[in-house]
């Protein structure tokens, strides 16, 4: 039959080319009897051809061929007509109720704390956004991959199971259309096709043969093409695999990386093709090379090309099945049926089970497809989900064992699907009842851990494998899942099966009971710390499971009693050693106890007692249910053996006490760590707390005296309480004292800790409230810190939110820090100093805080215990411990020793505890007396405490001893507490003595009242004393104040004449800017320039602490500084740099300020010599350091010695040279030196230089005016006639520092090697001056601060030093070079100056031109023979005319670029419309329009032009004011210290010698300026710019800010979920990162998006930062809610994100998962970090505080 079919198959034309019509194969298949065989023959012909090129496949062509040749024909065969039409019909037939989206790693999931049945119930982004849960208390988390959206699952949600999209009755769907049944023909076809397709997928996926295929798939002409296939494993790192491939295949790095990335993503990859021998050789080479770098060789196989082809297609067919099943429930059901059918006559299980069992052997890519198949079929149909779960449980043990042996992540293992089944309540019940799943899981645990069992059948995890044990936790997790929701209805079968599972679980606990026993090390310290982490980790994993088992048991009284019996039996079986050992007798004060001879300090002891603790938990639940009375029916009294039950927990507590007493210090850190976790919040519920409960159980059942004797014996303190003890050994005394303190503390806990439902009459809410109260008594805490200190239940809930507002109030956070909760005053009364969850540190802190608070409130410092709640009936006898003989003996002994001056067997802490016990006893008796008549109260603490200790003559009772203690000076701090106790004795005495006729409660109230009266009297007395002290202090202060005033009046003259020079450096602006300078002289430019008030400047070096006056002739002093590239002001973010550093001409700055060079300083001063020594020392120490360098020493980086800011240079501090102008000369010169004359003089000078340096060439002398003037006017030396003086001389030290700083600016600004002779060095100096001023002005404007009134100290000092450095820097350069630069700068405003590459007026930033021209201008006075500079008067005119010319040019710039759309411009103010300024603006603009051929337009009204001009020019004027102030030292007007926009403009104009109506400038200089205006407007470059309006920069430039972020963080996550990597089409986890500068989303930390920069690989973020922020950038990691600051290629740091939860806290990594909202204040702070150029500083500071040996590789971010 097979042969005949083969012939038939061959007769059909199945060429590899796509068939003309997909119906052909479909109709041919229809004629075959056996579809499976025919289908396989079809695939045998086509698949090897389609998937032939495995090494370098054309994926698009492959997909097209598969679709046309195989999948479309299959769809035709399935539907019998055009599949596109059928699928479209099915698509619109109605919404399916289950979402079923499978999460990929990194996707955000949402859970609702209000509605989810458990935390594993999650929603995908889309369902969440359209669900009711959006407005609930939701949580956000990042999926590890493999989960499943539970939208539509009614068992997952208490309310709101459907989102809008999956709602059954939503608009557009009817009940009928929700399930649109397929017609019978399609169903019949599906039943025929699906089994064959599934069988093929399964067979090919689990195919083991490397060289052969099943007979049906074999073809006659077999090729000899093989592949060497490398598989992924978790033993080898990326680099290991790349190294092995490079060596074995002799390939390039890029090819090896490509292979490695594919292997990591898909799980396998063909790395070599060829004949079998070649591939085999490659396989051996790869294995041997991989063994060189790791113990495990890489997994490599040689596969035939046809096998590879079919395996690849099988997965493609799986994806197709996923698609088809998404259209119809019928398809899913048919698929599930086919998967579950077992082949008749075969031993193999059903197909889905075969896939499950093969899962661990499959590679990653295959697993993903197959898991998706399961998700889209079985998990979408509840009935089949149940059947799948049964198959899963059937093979559970085998699957888990294989997973534990596997090395792949849990998320891609079939075992990870357990959460989808075991957490469904009905399914969990079914699996417990039908398959005893609890027993299956617990037995699996025992079967996978046998290697860790010792000869006593106890676990011992010494030398454990962390990876393997981590995988075992998955099994423990499944136990948690199955128990996560308690049954509401108990059937007999469920009860029986649960008990069976519980017994099985007890076997695990039996192996843990007493595991890893230790013995105290004596004499010699332990050599190697034993492993302890594994045992504690398993304890943590089991914590909630233990609680859940107890809760399940407590659901049913009979079940609880049976479970108690089973647990009791298990404890007794583990305690056989104890019962059979030798006994000893303990005697004290007439009582004796026979107990086992055992010492914790000598014998073996274990901290692990889960059986005993489980029994304690069950006992509490019995008490809570009131079922203790029935306990004897299940556990007879004689068999209860309470001494045995108490023994092991007591040993544990004794061990803790002895560790505190340092008796176990030779046992190393291992034991200390175990003790820490024993009491830590992560473990204490099922360790420490349960041990206390077990002792309370013992105390409630045993005779109190015997119980205390047992405690004394185990604490090894019976000798310490014998009267005869006498020792001089101080260490032993200290040890005894510590042990007594620890024992007393445990006794306090046994008697006083009743806040456990079932132990005391309390609710769960009261327990949590008490925990919170005691945490907040330590200090106010943020929400997360409180939550961290509270135990979580199985749903990760603490119950905190439900009660926190009852006990505390929330205090909102500021710009930094977080919000905190503060305890309400009314909750302070519940403070218990000996709260059993306090650590030693917390106890001390809480006690200190509460005493301090009481002192501030003028209250006594006594901290008695609050009245405890009543014990439950089962525990009511515990209070008898307080009044028993042994307790009285212990207390009396402690007090007697304290009174005895010679005794040292007591401490103050011990006394405090004894007082606390006394207080508890008296409170207990008081409460009982208040509730019942005296004769009914059996508790008799008062009389026992009042009784004499013995019949001796000097015998004393406790009250008498307290009176004596009150008088001991050393116990002054305890005096208030003693007083409180003595008063309480009186209160109880009065209650006892009241007549029986009076109702007890009444007498109790009277007692309380009298007690309150006493307290009130004391309080009033204390208040009176405090008031008297306050008045006394006030009187003294008044006297001192009077004396002070008198002294000042007497020495008034001295105060008036003293100038405050000393505080100069601390002030923000110089003091001369106020009253010392008249308002008229506050002008910086022109002949009316005010004086520069300079004072002697004496600075202190932060390194040597020596003072030095700043003088030109002295050695240099320097400011630490940082020069950096900046894009903070750019108007064109991400603008590419046209030229590299070598070719860039920095003389002219583009008006968009795309890239600037910023110089900032922290303001700290050093001697230049001291700094050089410091820098050399830093270099030396850096060479000796082993950890990563924090800064780049080659680039001159260092940390400021004082503030640790990152610096890379120093600015020399040069004093300002005072320049005084003679007013008479000024007036004379004003008549002579007009603007026209000044321009001619300047042009003549420049022309003269050109003639001088042109070497014989005839230069063109620029002519500005038509009329000729005499030659004498143009004389070369005429500029000198207006006033000169000799140049300033600087010391060599200052010159050196000037050259050093200038070279640094050049090197960093242009990113070139240092070259102090480069002609661009002065250009970069001017550029950084201009840009720094612009950046500071922009920052002040952005913050709405005044120009001079809000400068930070470091900004002020930095600008002052920078400007004076720039003046000096010119003198270190050849003046000929400066001339050339000046000529080029002036050519912008004087177009007739012939110069190369002069930019158009709209293509240059004129403030940069102004700074360069002002600083370079003195070079015109230089001559070969004599070194001159302009006189103050000459300078004043030079500055004035330069500034006026450039200002007029800038006005033209602004008006030409003004947006004529009035709606977007400034609003019209009252009176502006017909103002003089408006008329001038209109007239001037008409003139400009004529010169620009009408391109400028003239549609805008005058008032609009004037307002646009004023707004546009203000930043320029502000920058100019800063420039001239720091250049000349002239005090600015008062208005510039205040915050007034109107006053500011007129003050700026006044200071800069401008008319407030700026158009008057043009009128004043009209004859001179008109030809210039014509040339400016007629410039072809300008006219071209005007035609392209959109490309023009408008003024004022927009202030940059960080991008707008959404208020709700989930919107950002939604945005990230749609992010697709631009270079990768796969669904692998990506790390979307948002650039906060420009809003680009990048693919971070992925090889796919790495770039090569200067031969080095850099990540997408670093590459983006180089273009977007000149190497500096701020990113937000969206899926982690982390802000990252990046600088350069190798530096970065984390920074608090601006998103906060409702408690004012950030949530990096979304660990807590609370809803997050944008904090505008935090975001503003981040914006300021950027605009203040502090990003580099933040990074350096962060790296300095978080130094690591191996840091994060920022380069690949």
Curated annotation (Swiss-Prot):
- What does the entry list as the binding residues for a peptide? 148, 150, 153
Record annotation: effect of changing residue 245 to A = Group 3 mutant; abolished ability to degrade proteins with type-2 N-degrons without preventing degradation of proteins with type-1 N-degrons
The entry summarizes the disruption phenotype as follows:
Mice are viable and fertile, but show a decreased mass of skeletal muscle and adipose tissue. They have exocrine pancreatic insufficiency with impaired stimulus-secretion coupling and increased susceptibility to pancreatic injury. UBR1 and UBR2 double knockout embryos die at mid-gestation, with defects in neurogenesis and cardiovascular development. These defects included reduced proliferation as well as precocious migration and differentiation of neural progenitor cells.
Annotated consequence of substituting residue 112 to A: Group 1 mutant; abolished ability to degrade proteins with type-1 N-degrons without preventing degradation of proteins with type-2 N-degrons
Where is the segment annotated Disordered? 1-24, 842-868
Q: What is the effect of changing residue 157 to A?
A: Group 2 mutant; abolished ability to degrade proteins with type-1 N-degrons without preventing degradation of proteins with type-2 N-degrons
What residues bind Zn(2+) 2, as annotated?
A: 99, 112, 115, 124, 127, 133, 136, 149
N-acetylalanine is found on 2
Q: Give the organism, scientific name.
A: Mus musculus (Mouse)
Please report the name of this protein according to its UniProt entry: E3 ubiquitin-protein ligase UBR1
Query: Biological process GO terms, please?
Result: cellular response to L-leucine; negative regulation of TOR signaling; protein ubiquitination; ubiquitin-dependent protein catabolic process; ubiquitin-dependent protein catabolic process via the N-end rule pathway
Enumerate the UniProt keywords alphabetically: Acetylation, Cytoplasm, Metal-binding, Phosphoprotein, Transferase, Ubl conjugation pathway, Zinc, Zinc-finger
